[in-house]
Amino acid sequence: MTSEPEFQQAYDEIVSSVEDSKIFEKFPQYKKVLPIVSVPERIIQFRVTWENDNGEQEVAQGYRVQFNSAKGPYKGGLRFHPSVNLSILKFLGFEQIFKNALTGLDMGGGKGGLCVDLKGKSDNEIRRICYAFMRELSRHIGKDTDVPAGDIGVGGREIGYLFGAYRSYKNSWEGVLTGKGLNWGGSLIRPEATGFGLVYYTQAMIDYATNGKESFEGKRVTISGSGNVAQYAALKVIELGGIVVSLSDSKGCIISETGITSEQIHDIASAKIRFKSLEEIVDEYSTFSESKMKYVAGARPWTHVSNVDIALPCATQNEVSGDEAKALVASGVKFVAEGANMGSTPEAISVFETARSTATNAKDAVWFGPPKAANLGGVAVSGLEMAQNSQKVTWTAERVDQELKKIMINCFNDCIQAAQEYSTEKNTNTLPSLVKGANIASFVMVADAMLDQGDVF
């Protein structure tokens, strides 16, 4: 695995969590699972050719890594990006196995994509690319086999083209993709799911750490990002009585000591569709004219906020460094939960985990919610979309939201139980590690299914 650094990193994280626990001592048979679960059940590589707008033929490499189906049909996104390669897709597919297991829904893990740059390509050419990609992929997927979703480069438009291609090639309308349009099989609450789910998970953390005495009410929350996840997380925090003191984009961040309002977040959402930066939005929109809003160019919010209780990184990977983590701890942060995948660097996670493991009581601890658990709301609602498709029904927004909340709370409880049951930590006065809890809980779920079905013997 040395030539696959991304995959190796994901594998090592799971291994270190389960090895640094009592699990192999209690259940030696689980040791046999590691070498088996680390090898994909199937890797499909295929040629994708299409005609560009100049009438010339182009070719790219397509992939689908069908990693593990012990818990259900393979489930994971399709990525159309020039960085797509087998190591990255194996890393993402491997992570997906365990994230999907934590939802409690019947979903295995997989990932796929195409090594292509869609920038500058017309709608027509993108449609031809999607049809060419699905021409081969359609042989290997199905509602009970493999149900892909979107990812980087594959949004609602591309999902539409891919679904249309599948329907055309197979002469079958079935829930073979998630993230579909609402009037052709999609689910309500899908755009909100990751942000809402993140807040529900964080609420469960607060509830547990304070024995139900505290909630988001009055808490100061620093959020990074201003896309889908950040917007809906911020709106849910405000709904629950929290104060959102920051948002950011790739060019800088906005800080508001008195709190960003839901009206301002709606303005940011509508402006972001037109690709406006936060700097432009703060200058141009009347909702920001009288508010005490500070824009900091070229910065992330972590070192510019003070007296914060909760941090929710929702922008991109490695956006919280070790030094920024120390700044957050110094500013009083007690809860950190990741809306972005790998939002914190290993150094930052070490800072948070050290602040937790060395605390003399739960009140002084800093608690870190890992992305594997904290941001699984998106894939959870994808699973609920599959359930609705299988019944040929559409649930109300209230029902989907209720199911999402239940999934996030159950996931949190599973992480806590695994951390407590299998922990080797000496300090029992502090809070348990949710990083280890998420890794161990998800590993046990997948391992049990593989052992029961004879994948491991």
Swiss-Prot record:
Entries under InterPro entries matching the protein: Aminoacid_DH-like_N_sf, Glu/Leu/Phe/Val/Trp_DH, Glu/Leu/Phe/Val/Trp_DH_C, Glu/Leu/Phe/Val/Trp_DH_dimer, Glu/Leu/Phe/Val_DH_AS, Glu_DH, Glu_Leu_Phe_Val_DH, NAD(P)-bd_dom_sf
Keywords: Isopeptide bond, NADP, Oxidoreductase, Ubl conjugation
Catalytic residues in the record: K111
Key word Oxidoreductase present: yes
Binding locations of NAD(+): 175-204
Cross-link annotation Glycyl lysine isopeptide (Lys-Gly) (interchain with G-Cter in ubiquitin), location: K326, K372, K436
Catalytic activity of the protein: L-glutamate + NADP(+) + H2O = 2-oxoglutarate + NH4(+) + NADPH + H(+)
UniProt-listed Enzyme Commission number(s): 1.4.1.4
A Gene Ontology biological process term: glutamate biosynthetic process
GO CC annotation terms, alphabetical: cytosol; mitochondrion; nucleus
Molecular function per GO: glutamate dehydrogenase (NADP+) activity
Primary enzyme class: oxidoreductase
A Pfam family matched in the record: ELFV_dehydrog_N
UniProt keyword Ubl conjugation present: yes
Self-association and partners: Homohexamer.
Protein family: Belongs to the Glu/Leu/Phe/Val dehydrogenases family.
Protein name: NADP-specific glutamate dehydrogenase 2
